[in-house]
Amino acid sequence: MNIKLLDKITPLEQDFAKWYTDVITKGNLATYGVLKGNIVFMPNSYGIWENVQSNFNKIIKELNVKNLYLPTLIPESLINSEKDHVQGFAPELITVEKVGDKVLNEKLFLRPTSEVLFAEYFKTQLNSYNDLPLLLNQWANVFRWEKTTSPFLRNSEFLWQEGHTSHYSEEEAHQFSKKMIQIYANFFEEFLAIPVIIGQKTESEKFAGAHTTYTIEAMMKDGRALQSGTSHYLGQNFAKAFDISFKDKDNSKSFVYQTSWGISTRLIGAIIMVHGDNRGIIMPPKIATNQVDIITVFANKNPEVLQKANDLFKTLKNDFRVRINDSNKSVGFKAAQSEIEGTPIRIEIGPEDLKQNKVILIRRDTQEKIDVKIDELKSEIFSQIEKIHENLLMQAKRLLNEKIVDVEDYESLKKEIAKGNFVRVPFDGDKKEEEIIKKETFATPRCIPLNFIGETKKCIMTNKETKRYVIFAKSY
């Protein structure tokens, strides 16, 4: 193993923030762009996003969701149509005021999200109740001028999918928004090996212009939360602001009920901080850019090794995302590079292995080395992909379960937040009480967990009896 190469990564126990940026830069995941807050998604990270797209598209198409693409620029008059919405994004809006030397008559904004653009589109597509529901999604880039930036977590430009739907009834729309947050939770477990907490945002934390916001919250290795996906029930807020109406069964005019929902390239940051170690990122095998690295040993002096490696590549590439490293660099260097870049499975083949008609399979997550007969390699890789996924998920679940703590008073909350835990408390306060907690602990209300039913207790801030529980944590 090339220890010098691995030494470039700061130990996560020593400095988690520095470890995170080291993993990104040394793992060829991203490099900084020409503007503050912008990054270049290098092939090693963009491949993750491509695999997310491929797998998530299959899921939403089963729901009859259709993909489309809307323009990037939003006129000022349009974005001002929904007051709460524009106020929520005002500090982050990037404005276009000139084209060449000509000052525009109306300011244009780079989309921070696309609710208003979808609203205008829905207006042109809906005439009768027979046109409902209309279920749409776009894969796009969005722009938000963040004050504090961090690669993948907070960027001035990032990638996401945003689904937008219009429905006939309140019940149908509300249920669809709940269905999507559950789909996100399932997707994170099934493809990213990341367990999440499903919950509802408090009033102060919900999406600007939404009636209700549902969220999935993931726990990073340092105990901080990462909001990893949201689903919003918009009610008729945008429908009435933009006159998105249809002719009902009795020929009367009715307004639609709407939802919006999205995940973004933040999930790449989640993968790093949930699964990574001091050797670099560990990519979950089902969405890994490369699932298998084939590494040759002494191939420069043994042409038969190179030939067999190429044969294996041709055999495996139809079932897995495979790359081959047949360079003349040392085996230790090639192995370390594979580890830093997070490839789940490494296959090493040298002249001694050929004599025994086998290869050595190394798991990125456990460092376990397994001798595998060449004719059994494909089935073994399928098996190991499942085992690696289950191991990553199990470890992440264990951490999440260990670091969710229940307390019943404010002093205990402060102590547990300081330890880096998710703290679940009886809480019926509002923004005022939330701000006090944030000021004194730097923790925010992550969500009202949907899958937790607690006993009636006294709120830790107001002392009133409540059945509502809220999880507080520091977050990214």
From Swiss-Prot:
Alphabetical keyword list: Aminoacyl-tRNA synthetase, ATP-binding, Cytoplasm, Ligase, Nucleotide-binding, Protein biosynthesis
Subcellular location: Cytoplasm
Primary localization: cytoplasm
CDD domains recorded: ProRS_core_arch_euk (cd00778)
Pfam family, one: ProRS-C_1
Keyword hit for Ligase: yes
SMART domains documented for this protein: ProRS-C_1 (SM00946)
Catalyzed chemical reaction(s): tRNA(Pro) + L-proline + ATP = L-prolyl-tRNA(Pro) + AMP + diphosphate
Biological process, per Gene Ontology: prolyl-tRNA aminoacylation
Top-level lineage group: Bacteria
UniProt EC number: 6.1.1.15
GO cellular component: aminoacyl-tRNA synthetase multienzyme complex; cytoplasm
Gene Ontology MF: a single term: ATP binding
Entry annotated with the keyword Ligase: yes
Subunit structure of this chain's protein: Homodimer.
Family: Belongs to the class-II aminoacyl-tRNA synthetase family. ProS type 3 subfamily.
Main function: Catalyzes the attachment of proline to tRNA(Pro) in a two-step reaction: proline is first activated by ATP to form Pro-AMP and then transferred to the acceptor end of tRNA(Pro).
Record's comment describing the protein's domains: Consists of three domains: the N-terminal catalytic domain, the anticodon-binding domain and the C-terminal extension.
Protein's recorded name: Proline--tRNA ligase
Organism lineage string: Bacteria, Bacillati, Mycoplasmatota, Mycoplasmoidales, Metamycoplasmataceae
